[in-house]
């Protein structure tokens, strides 16, 4: 369970992971060593899983964002576990695949990709379709992005019984 101080630390670090323990301590009203211990505990518990830099994809030459929805039919030779293994391997090995989700509903997978342009996107989509043994795919190209964030607000703390 997270207390208010842990929640505040997570909020601060998600906003700027480069904050020093001294800056965090000042913001939450604790000592530097207490903050250090709390952050280490959040890491050990797997709540904080890493620290990353947010980059501008356009400035890195990858201005095109697309979402691909795949439907995969399984056969006796190619069961769902095999398809998941192929998809997991393909997604993990390609740096242009930013996210890959196995989903419930009409589609089997939703994949977020970044590409230099239409030709690179076409090659990437062909590769993904081939790896999945896709029976159907729909690709949506992003025209404008109004919000893109990896920030996660913790669920509210359960209320104590009165």
Model-found features: residue ranges?
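A compositional/biophysical signature of low hydrophobicity enriched in polar/charged and small residues
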Residues: 1-162
């Amino acid at each position: 369970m997270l207390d208010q101080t842990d929640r505040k630390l997570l909020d601060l670090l998600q906003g700027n992971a480069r904050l020093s323990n001294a800056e965090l301590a000042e913001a939450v009203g604790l000592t530097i060593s207490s903050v250090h211990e709390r952050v280490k505990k959040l890491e050990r518990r797997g709540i904080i899983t890493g620290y990353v830099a947010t980059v501008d994809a356009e400035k890195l030459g990858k201005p095109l964002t697309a979402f691909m929805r795949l439907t995969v039919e399984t056969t006796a030779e190619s069961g769902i576990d095999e398809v998941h293994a192929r998809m997991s391997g393909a997604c993990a090995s390609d740096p242009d695949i930013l996210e890959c989700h196995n989903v419930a509903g009409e589609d089997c997978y939703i994949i977020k990709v970044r590409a230099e342009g239409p030709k690179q996107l076409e090659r990437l989509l062909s590769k993904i379709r081939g790896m999945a043994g896709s029976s159907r795919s729909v690709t949506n190209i992003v025209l404008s992005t109004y919000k893109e964030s990896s920030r996660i607000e913790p669920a509210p703390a359960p209320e104590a019984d009165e």
